[in-house]
Amino acid sequence: MQRPIFERLIHVPGPNPVLTMGGPDDWDGAMVEAGNVLKDHHTYYFYYHGYPKNTEKWGVEGYMIGVATAMHPLGPWSRYGDKPLLGVGPEGTWDSGLIACPAVLKERENEYYLFYSGNFPCHIGLARATNPLGPWTKYEKNPILEDFGYLGGVVKVGGKYYMYSEYPIDLNSPDQGPFCLATADHPEGPWERYEGNPILAVEGWGTWDDGGYSEAGMLYHEGMFHTFYGGTKWTKFESIGYAYSSDGKTFHKHPQNPVVMRERCPGISGFAEVHALFEPPLFYVYATQRYIVSLDEKESSFGREHLATHVLATSVPFRFDMPVMTLDSLAAEAVTELEACPPIGLENINSFALTAECSYDASAKAGLRVKVFPSYDGLSYDTEPTACFDNAFESGKCCRKTVAVDPMVKFAKVVLENLDGSKAIGDVKVVATLGSV
């Protein structure tokens, strides 16, 4: 077995969920699931597929593709537009029922390719654009590869394109399967299936991922292929594993797997459709987040899938900023709910600071208070704050303050209070700086 390039991966959960399904009349009002993330210049693009709740309005009972953007790899993410980025084809065409599993590749400046799966048994299609936000034009000779399952990712290495998918679907458990590879010299093809498929198969009953894998993205960095994937049990409890390869064909699972254990993420049943970016020394991992539901919730649990992020540090020391709360305004005397703040995971953190920033009205008399509430399990939080501080204050100014907080528990949340009795506070931001030294 090839020795892993990263001996250890240190997991820190992101501010999850980072994107939830849209409203009841939105095109993604019933469900959202993760596609790949592209960084282009200073902007991050999180592609995903969604399913409408109001199918009559949208005229389709299937997935369509959208995108959210951010200036930071952990968000906050903003949906682009109020329509899908790419919709299904006309009735009777090969992708008229659904399009999903977006994988976007930047070929060069002003030239982008979007690969996707369409209908069942899921052929692969291609669309082109001069901007990552589109408009996208479908390739006139689609599909470029027939019957290749759920698309995971496409990378270009040495002039050759490597396409990875979950195929065949349902081989190991419902909706899960092994990973397969196809290659081509051009995005349009012809695509040739690798004769050694599958390139990543289930190793045997009793392993943590013996139910197979959901589609997963692929990275290429400094001579190595990297994939983070959702591995499942038959009970659909999915954690995240990591595998690597020097040739894109023979993959080795990391001995530390699973590198993201769903058991350490409170209330979560699994992570699927996993993709990643690498900004050394940090991997930013993106996935569909599924929730544990009770028996009386199961009938309404369709769509209880949101988008999530995780950080995996490849070395120590490390430090990074994580957006925690972003509010356009906080009304006079208002106090945020604890549920409005995502959990801040501190299990692998020994350096923790919070930075508050906001803008005050010219006639404001008081400022912003920040309270930190601890939890040992991420489900129940103390009723008394473990830390409290007031942001810097000056009427009519944008003020900020950074305070170190003792990371003595596994999780923390923040509650914000406007101390002013008559004036709202604008442009409120709270950022956690997390690290290990």
Task: Name each model feature, range by range.
Residues S351-L354, V405-D427:
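Noncatalytic modules at the cell exterior or secretory-pathway interfaces
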Residues K365-G378:
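Short, surface-exposed beta-strand/strand-loop-strand elements in extracellular ectodomains
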Residues T383-F393:
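Solvent-exposed serine/threonine-rich low-complexity stretches and specific carbohydrate-binding patches
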